[in-house]
Amino acid sequence: IDLTLQGATLSEESIREHLKSILDMDLDDGITWEMKSISPIRHDDLYGGFRVKLNAAYEKIIVPFSIDISTGDVITPAPQDFIFMSRFSPNGNFRIKAYTVETIMAEKIEAILSLGILSTRPRDYYDVHMLLSTVKYDESNLSKALHLTATHRDSMDTIKEWSEGLKLIQDSKTM
């Protein structure tokens, strides 16, 4: 799970504090949580981030997963509200703010073009293909999101040369 904080301090202590208050909530759903670790990520990013490793337990089922938490990413045009229906809790639906599909695609396209043949993320190719072929999106917002993402990540020169980058990927024997 990726999480972007807006208007909040990003530190190991603040993350531990906020997550503890969330994980300690009794939702009467039978799920218990254990925070395993918090470690820094995105060392090359101006804003950095943290990876939180957790275990969720439901009866005898234990599911390990991680949350990557960062701040400073550009969300274009703005975060959207999504309503999700709980499968476990009788309390029903819950709302979250999430990236727009255009921002998700922009980040994946930027990663594909920036990393090129050095990419170790085949899921980005799959995700872009699936999103382009199954989800409605606004081309103008995608263009804006890609421009802002590349500017934020200081990769605009690479993005401007996208056709050469795609040719290298296409001709690669390892991709």
List where the protein language model places each region.
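Compositionally biased terminal segments of proteins
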Residues: 1-175
